[in-house]
Amino acid sequence: STILEAILDAYDEAGITRDPSTWERPAPTMQRVVDKYLEGDVKKDTVYSVFRMLQDYQIFTNDTNNCVTMFEWLKSVQVIDLTLYEDNIKKLIVSLVLDVFYAEMKQLKGSDQKDGFREIRTMILVDEAHQLMKMKFNSLRKIISEGRMFGVGMILSTQGMSDFKTDEDYSTFIKSWVVHNVTNPTKSDLASIFGASDPNLERYMSYITNAVTFQSICKLGNQVNYIEDVPYFK
């Protein structure tokens, strides 16, 4: 049994065929595909272990009534808490979410523009983003580099300025920065954000190392401002 065979069997079981008249029927869930795959005669290889984890952890629902598209799901604030999962499960879930999100994003037309401003459809906040960036997710890089056209923004929050440079230098895709207090920033870190020729690098260095809570430097394009954030309790 292959993954493709499991998918085709799940669709056949749901009564969905090449006949367009069947395409409005509820599609099989990912959980059903997982079950179909494991029902077959499969080798206990890497793919098997992944599908076994998906089944054991019950990652997906088997109720089609609970299924919506990714962009429908993101019409309200959603928080994905992966704290209790093992690293391999975290990586699997994040990879699936990013891949599905990117595929749906590409199906959208470009977001509207008016008076030089672009419509924002969805914002994604990734906390402790260094954990994702070092995992080399192709979809993460593509969402960051292509998302603006589709009205998708992404905020990558991390503790260190050098975290954005893994095998892939994510800083090259980022146009806006908000830098709070950072421990031991280097001149090269600042140069990668503000530009090596910026005459104010030493001033930025001093400000960042001495900034108190809610103080930061904001860089939007070529404009740099010292700002005081408005706390949530105000």
Regions found by a protein language model. Give the residues of each.
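P-loop NTPase motor core of the ASCE superfamily
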Residues: 162, 168-234
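Hydrophobic/aromatic beta-strand patches that form the interior of the parallel beta-sheet core
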Residues: 78-80, 155, 176-178
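P-loop NTPase motor domains
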Residues: 1-152, 165-168, 206-223
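A short linear-motif detector with a strong N-terminal bias
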Residues: 55-61, 155-159, 194-198
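Conserved H-loop
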Residues: 149-152, 157-163, 181
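An acidic- and aromatic-residue-enriched active-site/binding cleft used to recognize and process polar
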Residues: 85, 129, 159-161, 182-183
